[in-house]
């Protein structure tokens, strides 16, 4: 279905050109997160711009689902990262008193023996390893939950606008999240980011406003 199919369908036409531009710039900045050093800051700015764009589009089209889903995704990922990093840091704290050393023995002359300690390195205890695994699991779980909500956000945008690239964004993002532990996951996420840029670039500047609805969201929307 083409994006223009939502125009002239018997409703008020609204201008979303500003939101389109913000979403496009935000998506480009989010992709720039792969740049060393400044990537994190650029991604953060990009996510904020995308949130603002989705909020504006939702208000103008009487549908807040894209914004709500995307906001939940950001919260889930952020909280999981904070908690996961704290747990991983605790793993090294509880293991800080445990060290291992490498020893070499040399016989210099008959009857004499010299032991040289080459290095001493931190050693994770059983508790430390357990905390390390738990922390990594929390981060991975947050990424999956966040990916689910992002998928729902882009699927909602596809239903609202008819821009098929949003549907492709959701599809590649979800499979990328599920395979994030292997290389193909990163490739799929990159493809998803590219489709996201294409989606906002193809988004028309004007869309037909939908009538307000007070229907209760379906249960599978995974709301909290």
Model-flagged regions — what are they?
Residues 2-33, 42-81, 116-126, 142-180, ...:
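Membrane-interface extramembranous regions at the lipid-water interface
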Residues 85-109, 201:
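Functional transmembrane-helix hotspots
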Residues 102-123:
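Low-complexity, acidic polar-rich segments
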Residues 128-140:
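Alpha-helical transmembrane segments
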């Amino acid at each position: 279905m083409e994006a223009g199919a939502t125009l002239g369908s018997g409703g008020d036409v609204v201008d979303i050109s500003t939101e389109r531009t913000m979403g496009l710039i935000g998506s480009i900045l989010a992709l720039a997160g792969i740049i060393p050093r400044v990537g994190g800051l650029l991604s953060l700015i990009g996510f904020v711009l995308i949130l603002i764009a989705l909020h504006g589009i939702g208000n103008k089209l009487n549908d807040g689902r894209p914004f709500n889903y995307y906001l939940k995704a950001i919260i889930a990922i952020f909280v999981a990262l904070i908690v996961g990093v704290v747990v991983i840091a605790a793993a090294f704290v509880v293991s800080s008193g445990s060290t291992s050393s490498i020893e070499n023995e040399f016989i210099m002359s008959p009857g004499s023996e010299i032991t040289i300690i080459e290095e001493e390195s931190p050693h994770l205890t059983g508790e430390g390893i357990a905390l390390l695994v738990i922390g990594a699991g929390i981060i991975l779980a947050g990424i999956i939950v966040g990916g689910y909500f992002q998928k729902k956000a882009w699927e909602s945008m596809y239903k609202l606008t008819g821009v098929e690239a949003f549907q492709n964004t959701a599809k590649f993002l979800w499979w990328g999240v599920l395979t994030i532990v292997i290389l193909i996951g990163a490739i799929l996420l990159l493809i998803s980011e590219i489709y996201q840029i294409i989606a906002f670039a193809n988004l028309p500047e004007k869309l037909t406003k939908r009538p307000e609805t007070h229907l209760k969201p379906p249960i599978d929307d995974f709301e909290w």
